[in-house]
Amino acid sequence: MTITKNKISLMLNSKLGFSNNLCEEIVNTVFSNILEIAKVQKLTLKNFGSFEVKQKKQRPGINFHTKSPVMIASKKNLRFSPSEKLKALINKSMR
């Protein structure tokens, strides 16, 4: 099951009783702030996990169509590492 930002804002609306517009604004602001922080430094949310940008180096590869060697450009990847508490919670609910 996929949880969208819209579903999260509806959950906030039902729990807190705020308007739909305010809940959407809160969710969008939280996610945009998480992304902005994660772009420049490691972001750790206690009992949830951490977000970190990792730089992948340029590396050699092969063009599948022509079989010729190519250089794959360097790029940044956003990584999420779940906390031990989140892992335990997920594993507990799977049993």
Swiss-Prot record:
Keyword terms, alphabetized: DNA-binding
InterPro entries assigned: Hist_DNA-bd, IHF-like_DNA-bd_dom_sf
Cross-referenced PANTHER family: DNA-BINDING PROTEIN HU (PTHR33175), INTEGRATION HOST FACTOR SUBUNIT ALPHA (PTHR33175:SF2)
Family as reported in the entry's similarity comment: Belongs to the bacterial histone-like protein family.
Natural source organism: Rickettsia typhi (strain ATCC VR-144 / Wilmington)
Gene3D superfamilies: IHF-like DNA-binding proteins
An example Gene Ontology CC term for this record: cytosol
The protein's name in its UniProt record: Histone-like DNA-binding protein
One of the record's GO molecular function terms: DNA binding
One Pfam family linked to the record: Bac_DNA_binding
